Curated annotation (Swiss-Prot):
GO molecular function, one term: protein-folding chaperone binding
Extent of the signal sequence: 1-19
Name the UniProt record assigns to this protein: Plasminogen
GO cellular component, one term: cell surface
Note on domains (UniProt): Kringle domains mediate interaction with CSPG4.
Modified residues (Phosphoserine): 598, 690
Phylogenetic classification of the source organism: Eukaryota, Metazoa, Chordata, Craniata, Vertebrata
Localization, UniProt: Secreted
Biological role stated in the UniProt entry: Plasmin dissolves the fibrin of blood clots and acts as a proteolytic factor in a variety of other processes including embryonic development, tissue remodeling, tumor invasion, and inflammation. In ovulation, weakens the walls of the Graafian follicle. It activates the urokinase-type plasminogen activator, collagenases and several complement zymogens, such as C1, C4 and C5. Cleavage of fibronectin and laminin leads to cell detachment and apoptosis. Also cleaves fibrin, thrombospondin and von Willebrand factor. Its role in tissue remodeling and tumor invasion may be modulated by CSPG4. Angiostatin is an angiogenesis inhibitor that blocks neovascularization and growth of experimental primary and metastatic tumors in vivo.
Post-translational modifications reported in the UniProt record: In the presence of the inhibitor, the activation involves only cleavage after Arg-581, yielding two chains held together by two disulfide bonds. In the absence of the inhibitor, the activation involves additionally the removal of the activation peptide.
Note: Plasmin is inactivated by alpha-2-antiplasmin immediately after dissociation from the clot. In the presence of the inhibitor, the activation involves only cleavage after Arg-581, resulting in 2 chains held together by 2 disulfide bonds. Without the inhibitor, the activation also involves removal of the activation peptide.
EC number annotated for this UniProt entry: 3.4.21.7
Length: 812
């Protein structure tokens, strides 16, 4: 099930009023804790588990896990700080926040962390010990104060905070250096602030992060799971000097929040380096010259460039002298320059030579996203799969196998040298039912990958249909197959993938159950013992088994064949997806972007603009491309081409029958072709986005075109470039496009320059990968120059015009 379905099922398992209680827990799907002190109990839902954990008296319950299909609860004394985690299907682990936290709130009487040394570095005496000091406070005299081991605590509400008896015979007790939780104050620039302040400095209410009104934006909580973008609380997801929020005032897009700095010393910093590691956010060397040889401006000065990247605003970023630094999450260290004509530039920092161990893997730089659309498939259980897919079945990005963040694990290249654990590619190192990976979402430990098993004959993949092709009724019993995750599957398969017959849904032998029965789920098709998916499990239909030792297992239901040979957004040739340039030349694999068209004058045949095929009869382009003439017969469209000047057998040439300009003078236009294009493996439409969909900040997208290459190689052949989307809030900063970008536009580009769409690429596509297909998110519109540093390209935001596009296609 996708994230929304998981949340829905989760909420259904709660009783009224339990949501607030769970705020004190951190949940992780697919994670099970190895525990020695535990109780296994029957439970009807998460709320029952919660009550059992809170009411446990035999031991301190720090976590519990709920197994929905087993209707079982396991309450445990351990948590992920003290015990190892294993991956498991159909389980959600809940851990009490207070036992995971290493900070204090107020005077710290609720602190339950594991600090066990005093401010002076002396080890603490165990609270239950009587040597070298006989305690006044012990576990027996104060059983509710968390006096475990030798951890710092505050059982007497001391105003100076947590303390402990020391192991120094001459020092009875001393205080501990526990940092404040960033709830009512912030350290550094508030990157880790987790409080509930939700008003700006001027008193405006904050807009909820998951809302797109009144301000549409790209800081989507699901795309930034580690940024804690909850409710409408002030946060700092993008390297600003302090937390901020979008406001509920339509005339004020965003504003900083007034959050005080914490008064206690900040948590210990991460290791620092004299060389480049990752993005260089922990670089503390003394390079003070940019890549082009410009001397850096001092961070504390405001000439020749005024800025807010000051030592005062970024107190933890070591903005000393004029040394190159990366205070705001750029791709590398940089500095403002002393040249008044060049505001800032990256620096060239020598790379650290020693390779990181798995524990030291830099999680700040995720690997390049590998998103094969030409459907790779796997044989058998996928242990031999060595493809490059790195996307899960719900569209989440995979964590690198060598990384330990956000999920620590033992499935490393060192431990499984023959499993092909490269980068973050989907693999099956442990003989599971198919390739899987750990995810980059802290709340979802792992998922199976968005891959399909190769068919028994021919090795090809049975394609999944588009939404419009899904049947509304039950599957045809003669073609026992499923669509999507099989939630609507009504076939008659009644055996698991392992060959075990299914137990009837109404039966209570050999397994008793009460959640998934014909009575509790009358619309789920729980007939006889047929495989079904009543809970929307992402892994597909399942059943309780007739094996007394195996409660449930999944069924092997094939995907239904698509009614169409080619689906939108799915090329039949895998794109190169190189991080190279259009300017500078990165020649695309022929026909790997099959929606790309060349717009030409009908009489000279000269290419002058790009465009995107969005339906057999329709092309989307930029309105400014049609300034040459208002007559449709002036234009023609070339489809299926790779070479600009060479006509292959697969090239289609179609004249234009109608021009439709956007009525509010936005830079977007529709071309109706004089006849439908023939859809082939070399001519396939791109998919349109959902109306008003917002592309998340830093999403990797792709531009293509035959445009200006400024004398570099590759001219005349279709080129491509990989670009990150830049949130409009960032793009409109004074050092970039200075408030020129409208809400109906989006920015994308490498701020260092060198990668951009240029003259001749106008009107062409900017497509972004989403789960299993490419979506047309932008139409190339304008820019300040071509591939200039600090001047990203600007694209019409297609999602804002989907209603208009669909209406015009219907009416014409």
């Amino acid at each position: 099930m996708d994230h929304k379905e998981v949340i829905l099922l989760f909420l259904l398992l709660l009783k009224p009023g339990q949501g607030d209680s769970l705020d004190g827990y951190i949940s992780t799907q697919g994670a099970s804790l190895f525990s020695l002190t535990k109780k296994q109990l029957a439970a009807g839902g998460v709320s029952d588990c919660l009550a059992k954990c809170e009411g446990e008296t035999d031991f301190v319950c720090r976590s519990f896990q709920y197994h929905s299909k087993e209707q079982q609860c396991v309450i445990m004394a351990e948590n992920s700080k003290t015990s190892s985690i294993i991956r498991m299907r159909d389980v959600i682990l809940f851990e009490k926040r207070v036992y995971l936290s290493e900070c204090k709130t107020g005077i710290g009487n609720g602190y339950r962390g594991t600090m066990s040394r005093t401010k002076s570095g002396v080890a603490c005496q165990k609270w239950g010990a009587t040597f070298p000091h006989v305690p006044n406070y012990s576990p027996s005299t104060h059983p509710n104060e968390g006096l475990e081991e030798n951890y710092c605590r505050n059982p007497d509400n001391d105003e100076q905070g947590p303390w402990c008896y020391t192991t120094d015979p001459d020092k009875r007790y001393d205080y501990c250096n526990i940092p404040e939780c960033e709830e009512e104050c912030m350290y550094c620039s508030g990157e880790k602030y987790e409080g509930k302040i939700s008003k700006t400095m001027s008193g405006l209410d904050c807009q909820a992060w998951d809302s797109q009104s009144p301000h549409a934006h790209g800081y989507i909580p699901a795309k930034f799971p580690s940024k804690n973008l909850k409710m409408n609380y002030c946060r700092n997801p993008d390297g600003e000097p302090r937390p901020w929020c979008f406001t509920t005032d339509p005339t004020k897009r965003w504003e900083y929040c007034d959050i005080p700095r914490c008064t206690t010393p900040p948590p210990p910093p991460s290791p620092t380096y004299q060389c480049l590691k990752g993005r260089g956010e922990n670089y503390r060397g003394t390079v003070s010259v940019t890549v082009s040889g410009k001397t850096c401006q001092r961070w504390s000065e405001q000439t020749p460039h005024r800025h807010n990247r000051t030592p005062e605003n970024f107190p933890c970023k070591n903005l000393e002298e004029n040394y190159c630094r990366n205070p705001d999450g750029e791709t590398a260290p940089w500095c403002y320059t002393t040249d008044s004509q060049l505001r800032w530039e990256y620096c060239e920092i020598p790379s650290c030579e020693s390779s990181a161990s798995p524990d030291q893997s830099d999680s700040s730089v995720p690997p390049e996203e590998q998103t094969p659309v030409v459907q790779e498939c796997y044989q058998s259980d996928g242990q031999s799969y060595r493809g490059t897919s790195s996307t899960t079945i719900t569209g989440k990005k995979c964590q690198s196998w060598a990384a330990m963040f956000p999920h620590r694990h033992s499935k490393t290249p060192e431990n499984f040298p023959d499993a092909g654990l490269e980068m973050n590619y989907c693999r099956n190192p442990d003989g599971d039912k198919g390739p899987w990976c750990y995810t980059t979402d802290p709340s979802v430990r792992w998922e199976y990958c968005n891959l399909k098993r190769c068919s028994e004959t021919g090795g090809s993949v049975v394609e999944l249909p588009t939404v419009s092709q899904e049947p509304s009724g039950p599957s045809d019993s003669e073609t026992d197959c499923m669509y999507g995750n099989g939630k609507d599957y009504r076939g008659k398969t009644a055996v698991t993938a392992a060959g075990t017959p299914c137990q009837g849904w109404a039966a209570q032998e050999p397994h008793r159950h009460s959640i998934f029965t014909p009575q509790t789920n009358p619309r789920a098709g729980l007939e006889k013992n047929y495989c079904r998916n009543p809970d929307g499990d992402v892994n597909g239909p399942w059943c309780y088994t007739t094996n007394p030792r195996k409660l449930y297992d999944y069924c092997d239901i094939p995907l239904c064949a698509s009614a169409s040979s080619f689906e939108c957004g799915k090329p039949q040739v895998e794109p190169k997806k190189c991080p190279g340039r259009v300017v500078g030349g990165c020649v695309a694999n022929p026909h790997s972007w099959p929606w790309q068209i060349s717009l030409r004058t009908r009489f000279t045949g000269q290419h002058f603009c790009g465009g995107t095929l969005i339906a057999p009869e329709w092309v989307l382009t930029a309105a400014h491309c049609l300034e040459k003439s208002s007559r449709p017969e002036f234009y023609k469209v070339i489809l299926g081409a790779h070479e600009e000047y060479i006509r292959g057998l697969d090239v289609q040439e179609i004249s234009v029958a109608k021009l439709i300009l956007e009525p509010n003078n936005r830079d977007i236009a529709l071309l109706k072709l004089s006849r439908p294009a023939t859809i082939t493996d070399k001519v396939i439409p791109a998919c349109l986005p959902s109306p008003n969909y917002m592309v998340a900040d830093r999403t990797i997208c792709y531009i293509t075109g035959w445009g200006e290459t400024q004398g570099t190689f590759g001219a005349g052949r279709l080129k491509e470039a990989q670009l990150p989307v830049i949130e409009n809030k960032v793009c409109n900063r004074v050092e970039y496009l200075n408030n020129r970008v409208k809400s109906t536009e989006l920015c994308a580009g490498q701020l260092a320059g060198g990668v951009d769409s240029c003259q001749g690429d106008s009107g062409g596509p900017l497509v972004c990968f989403e789960k299993d297909k490419y979506i047309l998110q932008g139409v190339t519109s304008w820019g300040l120059g071509c591939a200039r540093p600090n001047k990203p390209g600007v694209y019409v935001r297609v999602s804002r015009f989907v209603d208009w596009i669909e209406r015009e296609m219907r009416n014409n």
